[in-house]
């Protein structure tokens, strides 16, 4: 497709302004929650991040598509997707100021527009994204829609915060990814709420064998087979999972035989862990989605630049202070960015320490997690230890 062949399109904000532009994606009309990211690079990573499920993503970077899209099927030496965060695009649509009709990059195999058309994703350019973001910052995240000329109108727009989105992106059955061969390999049970490939990569490169379980799996019943439990990122409102994931995590926290099991949560996993501990979460006005957000480590006083993608936050004032205390705080809006247990090896972060795309300032948190598993195995794990049976399990998410 060329700029001369592009169809007209319209981007409408519910109860707000509408904008005329051009379509460079799939000829479909769709709706969803409108959110924005200020990230300068990494649009393939963002679009395939399960945390964006059901959302219309507005890019503030003025020019999008200039380095094309790499081959999404390429895998690394660990069998993980090398250039994408999952095997499919999860955004409902993308909105950009200017689309780069010509692209150039040594890894690119297709244009962003061609990729969107193949994936059935609406994409609209020629939009004043600066004005859109100013509106969202003042009015808060809202529902919206992208209508493409000649495309059938989409069904009634459904607010993704009202839907169990995690069930749509989580694996349906367990799968197993062996860690990098090391002198010692630790075993982790990962609760899949929509885990990104680079989170898995950050574990396996450190010699961690990862068994991934569905979001509603009773992790408490199998935690004794592992050296640690990990709770992943994911989309939507965490309160939806109070009777499934949160209830399972609460049993895990309360089990007297599992008091020293290391637990690490990221993003949605952070929120679910906080809910299981008895805290509350709140919906943010417009959320934090960027690669350059400063977070203060309250234990050291050091500031880190972090990658973030969330529309909900933990209310730190509701934490049970005899058990959990804040670990990180956002220096822009003072929202909570992490919690840690006062005596047990349990902590979580709202931001993404795996940083893809984005900075790797906080990748040391994965090293700390491995060290906690080393201590747990040496000091607390009961013998004989029976590992969870992984023979015959698939090595990729089952959808």
UniProtKB/Swiss-Prot annotation:
Pathway this chain belongs to: Amino-acid biosynthesis; L-arginine biosynthesis; carbamoyl phosphate from bicarbonate: step 1/1
PROSITE patterns to which the protein is assigned, alphabetical: GATASE_TYPE_1
Enzyme class: ligase
One Pfam family linked to the record: CPSase_sm_chain
Assembly information from the UniProt record: Heterodimer composed of 2 chains; the small (or glutamine) chain promotes the hydrolysis of glutamine to ammonia, which is used by the large (or ammonia) chain to synthesize carbamoyl phosphate.
GO BP, one annotated term: pyrimidine nucleotide biosynthetic process
Every Glutamine amidotransferase type-1 domain range: 187-379
Main function: Small subunit of the arginine-specific carbamoyl phosphate synthase (CPSase). CPSase catalyzes the formation of carbamoyl phosphate from the ammonia moiety of glutamine, carbonate, and phosphate donated by ATP, constituting the first step of 2 biosynthetic pathways, one leading to arginine and/or urea and the other to pyrimidine nucleotides. The small subunit (glutamine amidotransferase) binds and cleaves glutamine to supply the large subunit with the substrate ammonia.
GO CC list: carbamoyl-phosphate synthase complex; cytoplasm
Record-listed E.C. numbers: 6.3.5.5
Alphabetical list of Gene3D superfamilies matching this protein: 3.40.50.880, Carbamoyl-phosphate synthase small subunit, N-terminal domain
Keyword terms, alphabetized: Amino-acid biosynthesis, Arginine biosynthesis, ATP-binding, Cytoplasm, Glutamine amidotransferase, Ligase, Nucleotide-binding
Active site: 267, 352, 354
Record localization: Cytoplasm
NCBIfam families listed in its UniProt record: CPSaseIIsmall, PRK12838.1
GO molecular function: ATP binding; carbamoyl-phosphate synthase (glutamine-hydrolyzing) activity; glutaminase activity
Chemical reaction(s) catalysed: hydrogencarbonate + L-glutamine + 2 ATP + H2O = carbamoyl phosphate + L-glutamate + 2 ADP + phosphate + 2 H(+)
Protein name per the record: Carbamoyl phosphate synthase arginine-specific small chain
Family to which the UniProt record says this protein belongs: Belongs to the CarA family.
